[in-house]
Amino acid sequence: MKSTFKSEYPFEKRKAESERIADRFKNRIPVICEKAEKSDIPEIDKRKYLVPADLTVGQFVYVIRKRIMLPPEKAIFIFVNDTLPPTAALMSAIYQEHKDKDGFLYVTYSGENTFGR
């Protein structure tokens, strides 16, 4: 899944921004959250997040759900490097394992209707 954030900003600018964030916010993780291309789930209002290092993947999914005002009958899935991270994993662990060379963690979200409507 390709990132529109990456295509809009050159590597040097992204790298400089993530380094500035890391210097200012020691216990926060810079995350870029974008909707999967062919998903019918709503678009998110912002894609840059500074999440607490001790936030779980499940808690981050909850944040996304609220921001896109996803109805309860819809499911949401997040992917990091095309894999589904464990819900109980800490965002800091996911970041250490999957962060991009530019210093951001790229998360893609997608949804499907769990009740067949």
From Swiss-Prot:
Changing L50A: Impairs ATG19-binding and autophagic activity. GO terms for molecular function: phosphatidylethanolamine binding; protein tag activity. InterPro entries: Atg8-like, Ubiquitin-like_domsf. Changing R117M: Normal processing after G-116 by ATG4. One of its GO terms (biological process) is regulation of membrane invagination. Residues 117 form a propeptide. The keyword Mitochondrion applies. Belongs to the ATG8 family. This is Autophagy-related protein 8. It comes from Saccharomyces cerevisiae (strain ATCC 204508 / S288c) (Baker's yeast). The gene is ATG8.
